[in-house]
């Protein structure tokens, strides 16, 4: 039996968006996210962290800084690293070949195979069109959350055109399914 996986963007989806986040002290988890992640894991979902970090590729900071920010996020949420089945940190700049950088579906497709995930039961959740597009490129459902980048009318139309749902936040997306009220 195939498992369900949820591919989660970091900045603007799990934590407040800070351009080129490079200071762990600036990490601020969004309200209710820790509880939602715990509930998703308890419900049997495998969680995957999928984040573009071109600041590394641009030479703004080192990979250790990204790991420190991820560790701080987990510490503030009182979660262990095992909450995520796998983590993809895409360091390519936008002008470089897109190996893992969203909207590339490579990490998703590799994870689907590695973890025997169901295409129908899995999804991508993020706050930007590149997050959504990675899911669409992999052939899995995608959803936008309004906790990071603004979801304007043009983006809403694009989302509707591609049957992409839009939610106020990650918790709102799963509130009924997980009884998070």
What residue spans do the PLM features occupy?
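Acidic active-site catalytic centers that drive phospho-/nucleotidyl reactions
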Residues: 9-11, 52, 127, 131
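Substrate-recognition element of Asp-dependent hydrolases with the DxDx(T/V) motif
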Residues: 33, 37-70, 83-96, 135
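A short acidic, helix-capping loop that chelates divalent metal ions and anchors anionic groups
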Residues: 18, 23, 55-60, 93-98, ...
